[in-house]
Amino acid sequence: MSARQENALKTRQKLLDVTNELIKEKGFYKLSIGDITERAGVAKGTFYIYFRHKEEIVLEICKNLFKETQLKLDEIKDSNIIEKLCLYFDCFIKEVQSYKIHIVREWLKGIVEKKENSDSMGTIKWLYDNEMLKNILFEAVENKELKSNTPINTLCEIILTQMYGMFTCWCMSDGNFNPEKAVKDFCEIQLKTIIGNYMENKRR
């Protein structure tokens, strides 16, 4: 790789890192491309060399988070389906909490009120969360942990409803609701009930 290519990769990564920082500080809707390039110390035109618009760079951030979670799952690839799901839920909630409660509230409000680009932002997150969860469940079917007739799409909807409900309750309670404790309780009390009927007997 040439020095020019290395510099291009560094600039692209800097734009990604800065965008993620700024979203955590001020939210997506108030963030402008000018804010990003000013913080990154590059010309505004530089942004468009790597990304077409603000939504595209956020999509890339989501992809990177997806990859980070997948790497953590790969580290416990020999663990059972319950342990993998609990790790995924833990990563899910901690990532949401890293954006601070006022930012998550703004995001939820934007989706409810259908603010500019809010539908696309909500869809992006839902698609990536759904894909990650499906991959975990499909792998469990292939490994004979879950039965071949496991209703994966239905289970994904049930589980994601629980996860999204947790960070919604966190916002509604002004932070008094503890999402991490809720995840732990969900894993210990509800999860086996939800997927228990589809687990192979030898794996229960």
Task: Go through the PLM ranges and name each one.
Residues F51, I57-L65:
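Alpha-helical DNA-contacting segments of helix-turn-helix folds
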Residues Q70, E116-N143, N153-E157, T161:
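Amphipathic alpha-helical packing segments from all-alpha helical-bundle domains
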Residues I33, C62-Q70:
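Short, basic, alpha-helical segments at the C-terminal edge of helix-turn-helix-like DNA-binding modules
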Residues V96-N117, T168-M172:
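Amphipathic alpha-helical segments used for helix-helix packing
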Residues G41-F51:
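Short hydrophobic/aromatic patch on the recognition helix
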